[in-house]
């Protein structure tokens, strides 16, 4: 029984756990990407490893790109001010 637990744990560590999140993609200054059309955001999001993306109109940060299943390594908009604009 203990062998089964150890083997299961080892397999979990070897395969790794990847998580994604749905969020506004941000640049290095904590600013969202302004958009008008969905194809722009979908292209931006998928190039950064997300499954898809679209332009969120009149959202919390205005018209900004929203990504679906964005990898953890990609910066997202967090609370606080946009430092670049």
From Swiss-Prot:
What residue stretches are annotated with the LCN-type CS-alpha/beta domain?
21-83
Q: Name one GO cellular component term.
A: extracellular region
Q: Main subcellular localization, coarse class?
A: secreted
Q: Name one GO biological process term.
A: defense response
- What does the sequence similarity comment in the record state about its family? Belongs to the long (4 C-C) scorpion toxin superfamily. Sodium channel inhibitor family. Alpha subfamily.
Summarize the protein's role.
Answer: Alpha toxins bind voltage-independently at site-3 of sodium channels (Nav) and inhibit the inactivation of the activated channels, thereby blocking neuronal transmission. This toxin expressed with the pET-14b vector has low inhibitory activity on sodium channels (11.33% on rNav1.2/SCN2A, 15.96% on mNav1.4/SCN4A and 5.04% on hNav1.5/SCN5A). When expressed with the pET-28a vector, this toxin has higher inhibitory activities (44.12% on rNav1.2/SCN2A, 25.40% on mNav1.4/SCN4A and 65.34% on hNav1.5/SCN5A).
| Name recorded for this polypeptide | Alpha-toxin BmalphaTx47
């Amino acid at each position: 029984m203990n062998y089964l637990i150890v083997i299961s744990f080892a397999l979990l560590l070897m395969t790794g756990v990847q998580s994604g999140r749905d969020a506004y993609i941000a640049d290095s200054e904590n600013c969202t990407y302004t958009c008008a059309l969905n194809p722009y955001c979908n292209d931006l999001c998928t190039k950064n490893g997300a499954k898809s993306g679209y332009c969120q109109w009149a959202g919390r940060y205005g018209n900004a790109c929203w990504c679906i299943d964005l990898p953890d390594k990609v910066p997202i908009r967090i609370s606080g001010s946009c430092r670049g604009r």
